[in-house]
């Protein structure tokens, strides 16, 4: 199937996680690992939602956005919920960047910015810190 890939995709380098030290019980905060177990009741709450996983959820996540907005004291339309930070970055780049509107970012930043820019053919202006 790779013969059908675009040149952009076929030259894409696979993600390589940051330095992986071989130390027992090491918690890699830079990889979003958490040293603590879920709060009490989380497993039961998750188990109670398993049946609904076969259905599409509310794509606007209106109830979740309203709850977050109320907690933060902002309007629900100021909240973006997505399937993780990578999806939200993708949505933001689609909304605000293109060939004529490059992404400006610091030289020391999240390593997925240049990958998304390459995939979406968005110029990236890197600002040294």
Feature names for model-found ranges:
Residues 61-102:
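Phosphate-binding glycine-rich loop
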Residues 1-55:
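N-terminal "arm"/small-domain region of PLP-dependent enzymes with the aminotransferase-like
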Residues 32-35, 85-86, 110:
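Short glycine-rich anion-binding loops that position phosphate/pyrophosphate groups of nucleotides
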Residues 95-129:
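PLP-dependent aminotransferase-like
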Residues 29, 56, 82, 127-128:
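Hydrophobic residues at beta-strand termini and immediately following loops
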Residues 25, 78, 123-125:
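Conserved beta-strand segments of alpha/beta enzyme cores
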Residues 6, 39-43, 61-65, 89, ...:
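A general structural signal for well-ordered alpha-helical segments in protein cores
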């Amino acid at each position: 199937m790779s013969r059908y890939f675009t040149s952009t995709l076929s030259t894409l380098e696979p993600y390589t996680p940051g330095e992986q030290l071989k130390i027992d019980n090491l918690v890699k905060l830079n990889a979003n690992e958490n040293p603590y177990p879920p709060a009490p009741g989380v497993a039961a709450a998750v188990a109670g939602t398993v049946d609904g996983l076969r259905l599409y959820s509310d794509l606007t996540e209106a109830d979740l956005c309203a709850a977050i907005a109320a907690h933060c004291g902002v309007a629900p339309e100021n909240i973006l919920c997505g399937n993780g930070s990578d999806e939200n970055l993708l949505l933001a780049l689609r909304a605000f960047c293109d060939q004529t509107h490059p992404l400006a970012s610091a030289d020391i930043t999240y390593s997925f910015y240049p990958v998304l820019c390459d995939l979406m053919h968005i110029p990236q202006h890197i600002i040294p810190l």
